[in-house]
Amino acid sequence: MSASKNEKIIKASVIPLIFPILLWIIHLTAQFIGLDLYKMGLLPRNTTGLLGIVTAPLIHGDFSHLISNTFPLIILGWIILFFYPKVSYFLFIFIYLVTGLLVWIFARQVYHIGASGIVYGFVSFLFFSGLFRKDNTSITLALIITFLYGGIVWGMLPGMKGISWESHLLGAVTGLVAAYLFRKVDPPAKKYDWEDGPDDFNVDDLEVSYDPEKNKFDI
């Protein structure tokens, strides 16, 4: 394995940990000092709630809420950073902010908290990238994502108490838009037959198509 490939794997394994670690630091600190952060959540169509576009994904109701988002963020973050490195950082910012803005515009007027909108955005991006890009890698990733996270589609339906289904739905919509906008970024490298490896023959051993003995003509 080349040094660049090792570096890519290490980078993809470390960077996706940063955001979940930040979430845990915030939650543990709030628990330790008895601070209730829910009012820093996103309150739709309220000017004071605009701050929640940035702060809401950082806040979680309890440990189960936080844990349910932690592992998908790490796994999906690794996949995106490894297979779509050029778009990965901007994708995170795009899904983070656009999902929040859409929730602020369209969602119910209750406090919305948690990073699940980002999770849904990541899942949607990976799934629809397979449809838009149509290369083998993207299609394979889309199938894997469908197998691992296909059941989360139920989280986009209204009716479940204590669930911001709007964040889930609008995160998925944002991921779909991102998959289309970035469909030509990080294309798979084209490989030709002659790139498979060095020639396994010696040019001196090649047969010559011209044989002077067989090409004599009687005059």
What are these regions (language model features)?
Residues 1-219:
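A detector for small-residue-rich transmembrane helices and their helix-helix packing motifs
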